Amino acid sequence: MSTSRPSQSSSNSGRSRRSARAMALATVDAKLHATFEESGSSFDYSSSVRISGTADGVNQPRHDKVTTAYLHHMQKGKMIQPFGCLLALDEKTCKVIAYSENAPEMLTMVSHAVPSVGDHPALGIGTDIKTLFTAPSASALQKALGFAEVLLLNPVLIHCKTSGKPFYAIIHRVTGSMIIDFEPVKPYEVPMTAAGALQSYKLAAKAITRLQSLPSGSMERLCDTMVQEVFELTGYDRVMAYKFHEDDHGEVIAEITKPGLEPYLGLHYPATDIPQASRFLFMKNKVRMIVDCHAKHVRVLQDEKLPFDLTLCGSTLRAPHSCHAQYMANMDSIASLVMAVVVNDNEEDGDTDAIQPQKRKRLWGLVVCHNTTPRFVPFPLRYACEFLAQVFAIHVNKEIELEYQIIEKNILRTQTLLCDLVMRDAPLGIVSESPNIMDLVKCDGAALIYKNKVWRLGVTPSESQIREIAFWLSEYHMDSTGFSTDSLSDAGFPSALSLGDVVCGMAAVRVTAKDVVFWFRSHTAAEIRWGGAKHEAGEKDDGRRMHPRSSFKVFLDVVKARSLPWKEYEIDAMHSLQLILRNAFKDTESMDLNTKAINTRLSDLKIEGMQELEAVTSEIVRLIETATVPILAVDVDGLVNGWNIKIAELTGLPVGEAMGKHLLTLVEDSSTDRVKKMLNLALLGEEEKNVQFEIKTHGSKMDSGPISLVVNACASRDLRDNVVGVCFVAHDITAQKNVMDKFTRIEGDYKAIVQNRNPLIPPIFGTDEFGWCCEWNPAMTKLTGWKREEVMDKMLLGELFGTHMAACRLKNQEAFVNLGVVLNKAMTGLETEKVPFGFFARNGKYVECLLSVSKKLDVEGLVTGVFCFLQLASPELQQALHIQRLSEQTALKRLNALSYMKRQIRNPLCGIIFSRKMLEGTALGTEQKQLLRTSAQCQQQLSKILDDSDLDSIIDGYLDLEMAEFTLHEVLVTSLSQVMTKSNGKSIRIVNDVAEQIVMETLYGDSLRLQQVLADFLLISINFTPNGGQVVVAGTLTKEQLGKSVHLVKLELSITHGGSGVPEALLNQMFGNNGLESEEGISLLISRKLLKLMNGDVRYLREAGKSAFILSAELAAAHNLKG
């Protein structure tokens, strides 16, 4: 896939490319499936994938009828696996609207008895489900069907009325109906006596604890641990972790097997092996089990009167499609269990607002279990596996974020070094020194074309081939300043075959019209190794069969002309270097002078920065000393060098006595090890949060006992980033701990404490062993707005705390999973630490707090539920967070309003452009044609301004100018037309005093930006000219010869106006000396920055009775001046 990429990256463009790739692959999947169905046993896997794979190039397959039929077949299949049965109910009447053919036998027949009408109820369309099960079972089903988050109640244990057989009922909703899968409870299995997610979570407690105990920083270790835990939990012969790469192909990155099985670790397989439709289903139904791929499927019969086809996407019984079943059989995998690993999409728009809770998700990979014999895993264990996969996904997400941070840090470091090289030896330092451009991104080679010379590094095409690529880019991608592709062949480069396998992928950025930087990559297959790829002697050629070895061979064939795809952050890094080089190339001749000026300016900034730093430091010290929360600090030796008024007040130890004492001598003996560990980690730069310890009291405070603190450690660093001490910001939780200690000492009646309205009693809620709410104290009612009677006997996970219709809505799915983990730990008797927790109260306010969970024991010491304690932030912190959220919301509202206005302006602008084009097709006079040309220039200027979404990039000088030929006459006429209405209203006369020889000169530059600048300065001049006054535009143009045919044009325009002139405050804003307080100030600053991009500037001169803007810019002459 080739991509001609604009110079600025965007998450939306990344998502749209993925979307387009997914649609293209879905069409390839559809054609493969159609070929498979037509070919039957003669299906040739390898050749079919290769033929279909050729579509994944420039000519992407279209979304046709074959694709639509295939997607319908995948989502609306009417077959299930025979290990259970299925009923579909009308949600309003609870009557059967569809059933599997084996349902009557499984649910209504009496074992070893001849069926008759009298001894069992009939099952068919319209049957009332309550007639099929015992009264308690029917009641349990009825309750579950009325539950909003019904998935959280699965599985529901029910018993058939006729046979008494136990089944797990697994319920989910689809449009207009409820689907119930019935799975028999095996004789050897101890059935779960109560529904609820917490019951299933208990089964994965050990695995979750192991995952959470892993140190971060190794994706390999995380995946190896996951497959090991799933292997032990489920008992399958093989467990693998798949990862999907950016081009959608898959790789086995972790594996564990029973002895004697062929290893698949390192296997790569084409994207088509797991179709896009299947990936979509994995996003919806995150655990998928196939008990026996050879088993005969069972048909589902539905009411013919139904106006829609039932979808079985969410059914646990959904039968595998024929091609997948054959693939499994070919690799001797009879049974499988698959868990989806769903993570946050990294290309999000950085939204951290609590009002926007849901992030875009993507399928990162799968955890796949295979067995060589039929294998059934009960639903409770599968539910536990799903929960484990969610916890695993959270850790994968953290590892991905950590990897990106490390990569970005390395790129920034390399960019800084390259920038330094450019400053010292522009531009050849980036290829002649170390590090060089190859160190910026992962590549096999790089090249630079500068002043018609070629410099090469690493594995690259020959010099003549590089020149040919540069010519091809200028011919076929001239509108793009950047280009990237993982296959030069697919991108259309004519001589791609001559490059061979050595160079397949390329990225390039154009610094100037003729100067280009290239990066090259070899084919992907060069980096791929798999132990299972070897063909064993005596084996028949299996290239035609669907098998991992065939998949690997096909994958290598597909990627032999492709490199690893270029990632978004790599393209961004190249673009940043492009901007650095663009400025460096302009300034090469005067580099020494610029370097001195920059160094002088940096020295000035350092002096100013130190003064500001001292002022800020003094203010921070004052805030720490007067803070209402305890704050203390120590040096690298652990000696106290900071002790604020609050902690002195709590401990009774004055500041003077605390200073110089070792911290470990001030804490209780029971907390020494914990504080020592926290201190050592902080001195290494690892900052722990929410650490609880006790500190001694002194003097008059000794009788009240030690103070309990929850502390966040923060490493103090010097200007060289060395750790020089540790600062501890604490919360006093003594009152809460006293309550909890007193609570734990009481055996039996706890209501006197929990239900006490004393403000010292924290918010407390609790659940029984099945996850139903059994406690909700007055403080909790006050905090959430929900009364005790409204929440009692509701499911804590889902009904009270959840992501959709819950009473207290959580921010996202990750928060929901983390809450489940904490409750699960306490329920299994493990000690839990305080964790950050947040939810939306009834009034919509977002509450942030710390959650502490304690197990509840009966007289025999068995866990009968949990108690949850919430610790709220101090009022000062809550106020600060509230102000921060308000500021973010205000900024977001303004941004939304601006986006709305820009979008609404475009529609009428398109109408104006259409009207103008229609007029151009009519008979017009010379003057009318000139007016239309002026109108067109104004419209183009407006469109360009509407595209300026990032003012900071303009202010910082990171804007690409669009160069083209133009005459100054066009610019002057268009600019003047924009201010004529204003000048006529004030009776101001505008005089164009620019010589005709100058205005008719053909120049080369960005005419629309020059037009924007001139119009802005004209408007400001008219605004500050008295009524009846005069504004005069004059200009000069000088040329310098840079070569035989190239002339540099220095243009200077003056705008002179009468009156007292532009206010000094507004001019200060133009020069960036004051904050941007007005629209005129922003306009002037942007205009000046645009002139600076044209190697120009603006001056403002005052004389008696008149003032003038002097605008300068450097352009190029398209041809020599006449005369």
Curated annotation (Swiss-Prot):
Gene3D superfamilies named among the record's database cross-references: 3.30.450.270, 3.30.450.40, Histidine kinase-like ATPase, C-terminal domain, PAS domain
Modification note: Contains one covalently linked phytochromobilin chromophore.
Pfam families cross-referenced by the UniProt entry: GAF, HATPase_c, HisKA, PAS, PAS_2, PHY
Residue span(s) of domain GAF: 267-449
InterPro entries, per database record: GAF (IPR003018), GAF-like_dom_sf (IPR029016), HATPase_C_sf (IPR036890), His_kinase_dom (IPR005467), HisK_dim/P_dom (IPR003661), PAS (IPR000014), PAS-assoc_C (IPR000700), PAS-like_dom_sf (IPR035965)
Residue ranges occupied by any PAS domain in the UniProt entry: 616-686, 749-823
Ranges annotated as spanning the membrane: none
Function statement: Regulatory photoreceptor which exists in two forms that are reversibly interconvertible by light: the Pr form that absorbs maximally in the red region of the spectrum and the Pfr form that absorbs maximally in the far-red region. Photoconversion of Pr to Pfr induces an array of morphogenic responses, whereas reconversion of Pfr to Pr cancels the induction of those responses. Pfr controls the expression of a number of nuclear genes including those encoding the small subunit of ribulose-bisphosphate carboxylase, chlorophyll A/B binding protein, protochlorophyllide reductase, rRNA, etc.
Protein name per UniProt: Phytochrome A-2
Gene from which this protein is expressed: PHYA2
